[in-house]
Structure formats: C-alpha cells, structure tokens
Amino acid sequence: MAGSSFRFRPAALPLQGALLILLLAPASGAAPASAADLSAAVTAATAELRQGWSADPTTAALPFPSVRLLPPDASVQGTCNPKAPARVPAPRAAYCASSGEVLLDRELLEKPYGRAQPSVGRALVTYWIATALAERLLPAAPEGAGSDPLRILQATCRGGVLLGASPARKSFPDATPLLIAARSAYGDRYATAVGSASQRGYALLTGLGATATSSCDAAEMAALVKGAVPDRALLATIEQLPPPDRAYGSLLGAINSQCKPLLPKRPCPRKQ
C-alpha cells in the first residue's frame, strides 16, 4: 500500500539485509512460558480466531469447529481415525472431518510451549489452531492419505489469512513469533512431506499479505513447493535465517511495503 508507514523500517537498508539484521537480533530475557498455562492459551487463541472466522465473509456462514485439547497419551490421529496408517510426521493439531473438531495433541504441544519465550509460546498455539481451522476450508484429503506439502502450505497460508482477520494479529504486532512457529512446526528431515521451514514461513507471510504471491490457491502454493515465487529473494532470505528457536527480533519493518491483504477491505497486519 503506497504511503503506509511501518514500525522500525530502516530506510537505508535493502529489504533482505534489514530482514536478516532484525531476525538475527538476540532473544529477549523474558521468562519461558509455563506448560501449565497451555489450556488457557488454547482457550484464548480459540476465542480470537473465532472472531476472525465470523468476520471473514468466506467463513462467516460456516459453523466454527470446536477446538479440543486432547488428554495426555491421546494423539490426533488415534482419536480421529485410529484405523488409518500413521502420519509421519505426526501433527500437533489437525481438523478431524469425522467429528468436525480441531484436535490438539497435548504432549506434542506442551514441550515446545513450555520452553518458549511467552510471545512465541502463544504464537505456537495460535498458529497450530489457525492452520487446523484452515484445513476445514480445503477439499477433503483422501482416506488414509499421508502428509502432503501442498496441503500443508495451503493450510498455513489460509491460517495466515484467518490470523490477519482476527484480534490475534493485535496479540502479535510483531509477526516474528508467528514466523518462528511456522518454521519450527516440523523438523527439516520431513521437508519433502510437509514443505521446508522457509516455504512454511513464506506461506504464512503470504496469508498475512506480506509477499508478492497473490493468494493461497493450490496453483500458487504448488509454485511455492517448486520455489517458483514472484519474490524469490524474500524466500531465499527466509532460508538464510537461523534456527527458528533463535530467530527473534522485529519482523514488521523488514518485510516489503507492498502489503496486499488477501481479504478485501481489511488492512494488513503490518499496518500501523
């Protein structure tokens, strides 16, 4: 958006250099989040995302799925479809079509949530719920289908759109914690099944209106799987970032000013 002002935008630095400098900034000294607060974080994130769901004309007429944090020792797949082949990697959250719920794996979420900085812990929970809600909007996956990078990236992108439409974006005026959550969602060894860390980060930023990719459509995300995006320099910059658990700092001023929200008549999350 021409003329928009963004916080911490370093005018003398090109986009990619600014992004690296800001994201390479050391972590703050805040105390790690407590795993005991996980249930409260799920409740808070769900309430915020529900508002975004109701505000978006593409989802307002659809029932909002219930969100359930599973008890210890219960997995998402074991609860939703125990007869299907095991998904590798196991998701921390997913939409269960048979019950119409978003299911969250308590054990897979507790450890990263408990050891994270508070803002990153909240972003982790919000990211997983948002992407699982976005799965509700995608065509049903074939019975017993394994992980699919295209589907993962579409859900990540549409989850970003949902985040941008909800009060959750005000909880993260700096989008860096959300980018960390997207990049750290799966281990690098699973990249062929779920997309690389940089692809997930780019997909999330696309949903937030911060890339040159214009939509979350299958064709756009298929191009991302191949690395054929309009702004390859940004994708390359995300690839150069340090491991997600060390990527702290301000992201807002580093993303290009051509912010184009994917929801009509809604400001980008990065706009002041």
Segment roles from a protein language model:
Residues 104, 127-140, 156:
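Active-site recognition of the HExxH zinc-binding catalytic motif
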Residues 110-127:
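Short pre-active-site segment immediately N-terminal to the catalytic Zn-binding motif
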Residues 14-27:
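Bacterial N-terminal signal peptides
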Residues 190-271:
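Pan-zinc metallopeptidase signature
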Residues 29-35:
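Boundary at the C-terminal end of the N-terminal hydrophobic targeting segment
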Residues 40-64, 150-190:
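Short helix/loop segments within enzyme catalytic domains
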Residues 1-10:
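N-terminal secretory signal peptides that target proteins for export/translocation
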Residues 72-103:
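Catalytic zinc-binding patch centered on the HExxH motif and its immediate surroundings
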